Each structure stands twice: as structure tokens, then as C-alpha cells.
Amino acid sequence: MDLKTPTSMRILKRDLRIGGWSADTNKLYRLWFELLALSPSYELAKRYRQQNGKLSKEDKDRKPADFEAVLKVFDDFGDVQKLFFKEWWTNRGLKLLGSPGNRPETKLLFKASQQRPADDEKLRRARSYFSTGWHEAHDPDVMVLAIPLNIGRQKALKEVKALIDQHAVQLFQPPTPKYELANKDMHIKSLIDCLSVLYMKAAKPKFKLWQVGVEAGISKTYSGQFDSKTTRRNANNSEEIRHLEMMTYRKFRQAKHIAENAARGIFPSMSKPAHMMNFDPEEFNKIIAAKIKWKKAAIKKLQNEVGT
């Protein structure tokens, strides 16, 4: 079965504006969600809440010193294991990572022509914008323009640009969300590689690091050279495999830091947390297996619903 996210569970532009809340488009939100699912501290917080504060002796012994901070994040973000990102986003994520109100955007209030002049109904729609949508977008400075459509795109755009330059104001800054991204400019590919390595290490706990690197596809130079199941280390490939091991080790270390920081409400950050828990691939192998089983059933259910 294809485990790709079903179309009905993919985030659309309209999902960034729901119930008086809005957020900017950012792939980092999805990665935060995915990496929380691979955080040992977050998993322990989930277990603690589900078991009404009761933990085994083993779990008590490994509970981090800042566990209360992790519990606070878990209480906000909730269980991220057995639901699609869209479900989590619409129910929790938007209010945690977004802010009240809409983002300002360019709108066509009405179009007038000789055949269809600016009548009272069109003017009413324009007034309606200023009594509703304008306030919902935080009362931005706006220009009401009459743009002739018969002067050509290039001339019209040039004149509009000149007016914008003439009346430019400070760029809009949305209200600070409850959880703000720690680094909006972090390279997405680097984060995806970290996620892939952490996930693959859990999916294949017996794999050596170079095998994890092959399966995670973190290196254009080395990952494609080897097969994780059939390649054997020898004098001819030892140096290349060593380089891949080093790359995978760095990504694995960074991924553990990112996941544990995410559990403390800090994302994305590769800094080593002061009280991070150890990542146990065997433990998360069971968690991933349960998640895959759930996802297969959920996709099948969605497909059946579409078919009916």
C-alpha cells in the first residue's frame, strides 16, 4: 500500500486561515510535527499523561530534569503519533504557530466598465471590505486605485509600482505566536536529512551508520554508490564508506538535538539541550511500526469513504 499522505489530508492554502487565525506558509511547521514524534522526551511526556502521571522505574530514572517544560509543550501540541499533520494543524497547530486575525493581502474590490459601471452594489461591496475584512487583516494602510485595463500590463504595473513606492509604509509584522520558530532561515534540506536519518535509524536499528546514510539518501556523492543490503566493506570502498559514516553520524547527532529541542518548544535548533534524553532506536522501532500500522488503516478508511 502507498503510504503517501492522501489528497484529502494535504495542507491547502485555505488551511492557513481558519476561524479567525492565520499563519504564513512554512514547511518548518510540518517538520516540527514530524520531529516531535521522534523525541524521547516527548514520548515520555505522552506516556506520563496517558498513564496519569505513573511511570515505570526505568522511565522515572531517565526522566530529564526539565521534564515540566516538556510536559507543558506536550499539553499544547498533544499526541503527534497517530494523526495526519492536517488534522493536527487544524485542531492545534494553527493556534500555536499562527496568530489571531488574517494576513493583509491584495484584493479586487470590484471591476467597472462602460457596460457594467460602478453601481451602488459594487460600492457597497467596497464599503463592506472596510467594515469587515480590513479590520480582520489588522487595519493595514491601503490604496484604492482605478487601474485602466486598456493601457497594457507593463504600463499599468509601472504606474502601480510608482504609487506603492510613493506611499510605502513599514512591512506588516504579525502578532507573535505562542510558539515562534527559532530560526526561520534554517536550510530545509538539512532538516529533512536529519529527520530521514533519525527515522531510518529507528526503522532499521541494526543498521550500521553508513547503511542508514544510504537508505536516508543524505549524500549525492556516496549514498547512491552503495546498497545497504548487498554492499560489503572492502579495501576498495573503505574510504568512501568512512566518509558516509561520518556524514551520517553528524546528521544523527544533529537530529537528536533538533528533536529534543522541539520537545521543549524550541525549533529548529541544533544546539545540544542541557537535559536531553538518549534516543533508543529499538524503542522507536516499535513506535514507528505501530504508526505505520495505524497509517495503513487510516488511508484504507479514507479511500473507502471516497469510494462510497
What are these regions (language model features)?
Residues 1-175, 301, 305-308:
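Intrinsically disordered, low-complexity acidic/Q/S/K-rich activation/interaction tracts characteristic
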Residues 172-308:
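K/R-rich mixed-charge low-complexity regions
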